[in-house]
């Protein structure tokens, strides 16, 4: 096979529209219920297929090796091992999503790597099989491979496609890094939210069980959330630090973005129930 270049594979961000922690298992993992929705704000990856199993990553990130970089290479290596593929790839990452913000950027990069290389290497795995590989890389990876907004249960691996409204979001990124591990290890984290049916959850007020704890531990998150709540219904996504406000119209979100204090960064993006990654895959 001669080297070929495939451009513009999106790795979209996600929002947790709600996140409920139901229990802690004996193995330390947490049972949860959450609703994932994609937003049209993405990292982008380019791939060049190589005739040898070599894997090489280029990134626009200043740090030498970041978590997302590791996951990209781990994803590619895992696909090689699962399929005994003897091809390799040169990969370019255009990193646009904030790191460690609860938007799933590293997991999304890994998912896009698996989906793209499965196509380009012609390894022929189904999305379900790719999801099995992805789950070993991170609990959020399967939802990005699944490619549709989803209600997730268990530790996040049990997915059911859903179609919530697709509003505009203003996403703000406080300049702090929240450790997911520390949040889930904190004794003050609520772990007893009752499990509810999907129908009940979709018709109940949405909340993030991690939000109160994170806001208490990270004043910048609390300050940013309080500012955004002045303009729209707002919550934290994942374990933070990013928070989002919901708007019916794009211009409404942009008007609030224009008022943003200089100390806070943010962007406007539309909710998407079909992942931009699936739309890119359909072009192949």
Swiss-Prot record:
The cross-references to SUPFAM superfamilies, in alphabetical order and at most eight, read: GHMP Kinase, C-terminal domain (SSF55060), Ribosomal protein S5 domain 2-like (SSF54211)
Q: Where, by residue number, does ATP bind?
A: 98-108
Tell me the name of the encoding gene. ispE
For this UniProt entry, which residues form the secretion signal?
Answer: none
Query: What EC number is given for this enzyme?
Result: 2.7.1.148
* Keywords tagged on the record: ATP-binding, Isoprene biosynthesis, Kinase, Nucleotide-binding, Transferase
Instruction: Tell me what organism the protein belongs to.
Output: Shewanella pealeana (strain ATCC 700345 / ANG-SQ1)
InterPro entries the UniProt entry points to: GHMP_kinase_C_dom, GHMP_kinase_C_sf, GHMP_kinase_N_dom, IspE, Ribosomal_Su5_D2-typ_SF, Ribsml_uS5_D2-typ_fold_subgr
Source organism superkingdom: Bacteria
Which reactions fall under this protein's catalytic activity?
4-CDP-2-C-methyl-D-erythritol + ATP = 4-CDP-2-C-methyl-D-erythritol 2-phosphate + ADP + H(+)
Q: Name the chain's protein.
A: 4-diphosphocytidyl-2-C-methyl-D-erythritol kinase
Role: Catalyzes the phosphorylation of the position 2 hydroxy group of 4-diphosphocytidyl-2C-methyl-D-erythritol.
Enumerate the active-site residues: 14, 140
One GO molecular function term of this record is: ATP binding
One Pfam annotation reads: GHMP_kinases_N
Per the record, the similarity remark reads: Belongs to the GHMP kinase family. IspE subfamily.
């Amino acid at each position: 096979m001669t080297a070929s270049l495939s451009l513009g594979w999106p790795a979209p961000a996600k929002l947790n529209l709600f996140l409920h922690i139901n229990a802690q298992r004996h193995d330390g993992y947490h049972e949860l219920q959450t609703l994932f929705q994609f937003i049209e704000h993405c990292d982008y990856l380019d791939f060049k297929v190589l005739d040898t199993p070599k894997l090489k990553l280029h990134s626009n990130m200043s740090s030498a090796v970041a978590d997302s970089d590791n996951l990209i290479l781990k994803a590619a290596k895992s696909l090689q091992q699962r399929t005994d593929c003897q091809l390799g790839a040169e990969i370019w990452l255009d990193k646009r999503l904030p790191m460690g913000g609860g938007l799933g950027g590293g997991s999304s990069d890994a998912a896009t790597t698996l989906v793209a290389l499965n196509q380009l290497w012609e390894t022929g795995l189904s999305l379900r099989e790719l999801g099995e590989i992805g789950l070993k890389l991170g609990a959020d990876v399967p939802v990005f491979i699944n490619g549709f907004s989803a209600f997730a249960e268990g530790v996040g691996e049990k997915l059911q496609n859903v179609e919530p409204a697709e509003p505009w979001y203003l996403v703000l990124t406080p300049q702090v890094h929240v450790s997911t591990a520390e949040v889930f290890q904190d004794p003050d984290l609520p772990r007893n939210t009752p499990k509810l049916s999907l129908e009940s959850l979709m018709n109940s007020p949405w909340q993030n069980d991690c939000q109160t704890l994170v806001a208490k531990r990270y004043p910048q998150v609390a300050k940013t959330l309080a500012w955004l709540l002045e303009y729209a219904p707002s919550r934290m996504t994942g374990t933070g630090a990013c928070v989002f406000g919901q708007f019916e119209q794009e211009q409404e979100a942009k008007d609030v973005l224009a008022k943003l204090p200089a100390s806070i960064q943010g962007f406007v993006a539309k909710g998407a129930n079909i992942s931009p990654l699936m739309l890119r895959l359909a072009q192949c």
